[in-house]
Amino acid sequence: MNNLTNPSKLALNSSLTKTGRRKTSIATVQLFPGNGEFTINGISGIEYMQQKEELIFAIQEPLHFLKLKNEFNLIIKVKGGGLVGQVNAIKLGIARALCEFDLTYRNSLKLKGFLTRDPRCKERKKYGLKKARKAPQFSKR
């Protein structure tokens, strides 16, 4: 982690790295000063998200909310889970990095719910049941 002399400004050659998680997805987000481009696992973010506008917008939502869309470049490494779980993990990582960048963003991001980690995960299957909660059919006679 870089110790910045002025916590509200990021040096041109430095970056902030934060982690976000959702279900089984883990995303590591690097935030650089730039022009709004983002890459995911070495591929353009738009290409990685298969041109799906709602997923692309969801990734950039914390930046849109703070009106910083064209201020930062993002390098994202994500693994595990499906696309939606990965998007939510990335979104949490971006929000955490923005808080590290400037503490004044923390309250507005927290009120909007960007800093809340969603704890819901798949429930494990129990023995004697067909799925996590589905029981075999019961017959009285």
From Swiss-Prot:
Gene (name only): rps9
For the keyword Ribonucleoprotein, the answer is yes
One Gene Ontology biological process: translation
Q: Which organism is it from?
A: Tupiella akineta (Green alga)
Its primary localisation, in coarse terms, equals: plastid
- Fetch the HAMAP family from UniProt: Ribosomal_uS9_B
Q: This protein is called what?
A: Small ribosomal subunit protein uS9c
Q: Which SUPFAM superfamilies match?
A: Ribosomal protein S5 domain 2-like (SSF54211)
Similarity section = Belongs to the universal ribosomal protein uS9 family.
